[in-house]
Amino acid sequence: MSVSPLPITAVNHIALTTPDLDRLADFYERVFGAEVLARAEGEPRKFFIKLTAGTSLHVFERADAAKAAAASAFDCGSINHFALEAREPETFVAIRNELIAQRRVSETVYDAPGVYTLFATDPDGLLIELLVPQRSGWTPPFATEQFVPLGEPASPGP
């Protein structure tokens, strides 16, 4: 069946497991200003972290989260990373600075087609990409590197 355009309106949520629910909530609240919603203290403890209107992380606490994820990767899939888009360049810079302060990010910012992007990790080691659309008249207040997608050769230097 071929349907065009894709009949999906948005990503509603991404489900994650963590061995420390409170630590993960603190990280997303502090770094991204995310709102923690609908805490449930039963077994397993869980909550939603609101990222944008209609998009959230659904996080479940599981003491053996890393071990269980590795053991069941082929049963339930895995995730390499997810990307969050900053609304404004100033927000991108502020989040980058907080990630640097927490030592959760490579300080490298990439100049990719149409966006500036960086990669960081959350307290459980999940890779997060943060990007901001390139805008006329705004230049990042730090050096950037040209982004080279995996599998493509880097262009020769000057």
Where are these regions (language model features)?
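Short beta-strand/turn micro-motifs at beta-sheet edges
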Residues: 1-4, 67-72
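Vicinal oxygen chelate
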Residues: 2-7, 10-19, 47-51, 70-158, ...
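Core segments of cupin and vicinal oxygen chelate
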Residues: 6, 16-64
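Hydrophobic pocket/interface hotspot
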Residues: 24, 28, 82, 99
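Alpha-helical elements of the RecA-like P-loop NTPase motor core of helicases
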Residues: 25-26, 93, 128-129
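Short, flexible, mixed-charge acidic loops at enzyme active sites
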Residues: 63, 71-74, 143-145
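A short, acidic/glycine-rich surface segment
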Residues: 64-70, 106, 138
